[in-house]
Design a protein with these regions (language model features):
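Solvent-exposed loop/turn and edge beta-strand elements of beta-rich ligand-binding domains
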Residues: 1-179
Length: 179
């Protein structure tokens, strides 16, 4: 039988220590490669091919132990994204500088500055940014309004699912009423 180029011969899963053992019969004298075909959702799927060959070791050798990647650990890279928010006056649509926002784990119940993973203040363009956010679901809430504006109780849920993903949101705010 002929094995087609790039055909899947076998697959294996990592054990609890992160080790993988492929247990299959491969013909000797050929070049092969191992490649990641699935990973945990938190990680970037690698397209790296780890090449190796099977050389004849003599008739008394029944099993060949092959190490890939020069016997070094293969690292998986976490998915990271960012959040870019825009703070706008509800009535005038003008951008608002000086509002403080917090980023929280999705299971956080008290959305306070002390419990925030990160905080950011809107700049002169009304923009705040949270960078290098790992894969997952988060909450964003305004912690302190800009001068002259009312507290905003809106809570935004954002999800980072893809590497280098930018989640954009717009937060509206009302001015303190003039008496």
């Amino acid at each position: 039988d002929v094995i087609p180029k790039d055909a899947l011969i076998t697959f294996a899963n990592c054990d609890k220590n992160g080790s993988i053992v492929f247990d299959c019969d491969l013909p000797v004298g050929f070049k092969w490669y191992a490649k990641e075909i699935a990973t945990d959702a938190h990680y970037i799927l690698s397209d790296t091919k780890y090449e190796f060959d099977t050389e004849y070791q003599g008739q008394d050798i029944k099993v060949i132990d092959i190490k890939i990647n020069n016997d070094k650990a293969i690292e998986n890279n976490l998915i990271y994204g960012s959040v870019k928010g825009l703070k706008v006056d509800r009535e005038t649509q003008e951008v608002i500088k000086g509002a403080t926002f917090g980023l929280f784990k999705s299971d956080t119940t008290e959305l306070t500055e002390e419990n925030a993973i990160l905080t950011a203040v809107t700049d002169e363009n009304g923009i705040f940014t949270f960078s290098n956010i790992p894969y997952g679901e988060y909450l964003i809430k305004e912690l302190k309004p800009a001068d002259g504006y009312l507290d905003n109780e809106d809570v935004f849920t954002v999800t980072i699912k893809n590497n280098e993903q930018v989640v954009e949101l717009t937060a509206l705010n009302d001015k303190v009423p003039e008496l």
